[in-house]
Structure formats: C-alpha cells, structure tokens
C-alpha cells in the first residue's frame, strides 16, 4: 500500500495496531481541537500514553503529516471497525465548538486515485 504524495512531513507514531484487516473504503476526518502545526501533531502522537494516532494530519497551514502508514490501522476514531477501513486524518481546528476545520485542505480525490 502506498502513502500520499501530498505528505510534507513524516513522523511515524508507535500508536497503531499493525496491518489492517480490511481494505480502505472510506476517509475519516477528525478535529484535533487546536491550531496545530504538523510538527506538533507528530509530537502528540509519538506519546504512547495518549493511545491515539492517525494516518495523516493536516496542520493549520495546510501541510500534511504522515503519522501511520496507510497499510497500518491507526487509533483515531475510537472504532476498530472504522479505523481498519479508513484513511484517518486529524485536522487542525478551532478550539471552541463547533470546532471548525478547513476541509478544503483535504484532497478527497487523492486516496481514490490509487
């Protein structure tokens, strides 16, 4: 399985379950509740105590982090069934409800071209 060519920064998290048990058929965006950079996102998901990760992170400036290889299941949505089949994307967002994130930064067609 290949990773996105849109990645600007790589910091691989130890927080994942290894190889997926289902093929990818969906995208799950999730807000990180903060205007984080990709460097900050990478550091957050390096901490094993947080028990969280994502395949990709999108920083406040639109740069893209590779955090967990697409071939592996990340720990993003609190659903094993979903995370096994989704490309998970943590997005920088506002810090107050409704936690707006700029979804125009996500290139939705990119994962479907593979």
Identify the residue ranges that each predicted region occupies:
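Soluble periplasmic/extracytoplasmic beta-strand elements of cell-envelope proteins
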Residues: 28, 88-90
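A generic signature of intrinsically disordered, low-complexity regions enriched in glycine/proline
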Residues: 19-20, 94, 106
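A generic structural motif
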Residues: 92-98
């Amino acid at each position: 399985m290949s990773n996105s060519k849109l990645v600007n920064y790589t910091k691989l998290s130890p927080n994942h379950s290894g190889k997926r048990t289902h093929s990818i058929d969906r995208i799950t965006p999730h807000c990180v509740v903060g205007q984080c950079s990709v460097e900050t996102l990478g550091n957050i998901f390096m901490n094993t105590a947080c028990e969280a990760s994502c395949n990709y992170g999108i920083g406040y400036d639109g740069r893209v982090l590779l955090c967990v290889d697409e071939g592996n299941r990340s720990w993003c949505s609190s659903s094993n069934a979903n995370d096994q089949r989704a490309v998970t994307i943590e997005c920088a967002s506002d810090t107050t409800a409704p936690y707006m994130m700029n979804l125009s930064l996500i290139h939705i067609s990119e994962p479907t071209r593979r």
